[in-house]
Amino acid sequence: MPVNPPFPLGQVVATPAALKLVPPEVLLQWLHRHQTGDWGAVGPQDWAANDRALTDGDRLLSSYLTDGGTKVWIITEWDRSATTVLLPEEY
């Protein structure tokens, strides 16, 4: 039985740099993890902030690492209108 995710992703976009580094199948896995509350490689404070944001309506930030060790962020806006995949230096 499918389970509804805790929040919508809205329009999903990715920067060219992120698309160059992350294979499509990995990107889909990360988006699923993000949408189901697995925030990846964030610290405990950011993890707790994301958990609070699910009810408070703040932005959500996940961080994942490529096989080469490059950090990639996934950010869903506070209003859940859009989710962006980007490198931290592009923020």
Regions found by a protein language model. Name each.
Residues 2-61:
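Compact soluble domain cores
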Residues 56-91:
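Short, compact, well-ordered microdomains
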